[in-house]
């Protein structure tokens, strides 16, 4: 269930359960596991039960070094094992995501362009966009355009490009030759179920003065 929940995180490629089954009930070196599976990160966990109480220990590890990125323990009532399992899965996936994102962004910031994939360029674009400084919007735009060069099917790249142009248009920092609304609409067509694309589209509408569309 946790594998399923983590696979819903847009920027993650998660190793299938059958690939990890060989390590069940074993204590292999995390670095070897990561190398065998081609994984950048490894999630490790254990369950202990005492009476009606159950404790889940989870840790997120960096594959190459085995370094801890995040760890937490969860306690619950074991009377309804399915309910507590669902609670654990939801909590772990929700709390792990920002730590994974921060780690991935920091990794992407250390890469040269030649080493980057489209997702790395998107991490760089979002990092600059989220700083909300005038100069950073231009840099975010450049990274979004680079992501589009690498993979024009990335809806989020078009959304970031659109919102950066919309902000720059509002700030009158640069002549805008492309329509931010059209770029945002292209993003939604490519990634209709991406909440971040829809959120950025709302910002584009807001900058265009269409508050009704922004709120929808």
PLM segments and residue spans:
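Catalytic-center loop of serine/cysteine hydrolases
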Residues: 1-139
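Structural signature of tandem alpha-helical TPR/SEL1-like repeats
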Residues: 136-142, 170-186, 207-216
């Amino acid at each position: 269930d946790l594998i399923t929940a983590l696979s819903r995180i847009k920027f993650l490629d998660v190793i299938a359960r059958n690939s990890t089954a060989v390590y069940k009930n074993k204590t292999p070196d995390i670095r070897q596991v990561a190398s065998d599976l081609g994984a950048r990160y490894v999630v490790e966990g254990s369950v202990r039960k005492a009476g009606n109480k159950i404790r889940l220990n989870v840790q997120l590890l960096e594959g190459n070094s085995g370094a801890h990125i995040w760890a937490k323990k969860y306690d619950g009532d074991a009377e309804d094992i399915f309910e507590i399992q669902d609670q654990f899965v939801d909590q772990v996936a929700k709390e792990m995501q920002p730590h994974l994102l921060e780690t991935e962004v920091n990794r992407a910031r250390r890469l040269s362009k030649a080493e980057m994939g489209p997702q790395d360029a998107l991490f760089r674009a979002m990092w600059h966009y989220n700083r909300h400084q005038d100069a950073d919007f231009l840099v975010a735009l450049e990274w979004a355009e680079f992501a589009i060069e690498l993979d024009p099917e990335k809806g989020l790249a078009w959304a970031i490009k659109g919102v950066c142009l919309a902000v720059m248009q509002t700030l009158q920092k640069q002549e805008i030759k492309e329509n931010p609304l059209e770029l945002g609409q292209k993003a939604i067509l490519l990634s209709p179920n991406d909440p971040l694309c829809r959120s950025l589209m709302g910002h584009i509408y807001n900058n265009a003065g269409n508050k009704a569309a922004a709120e929808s």
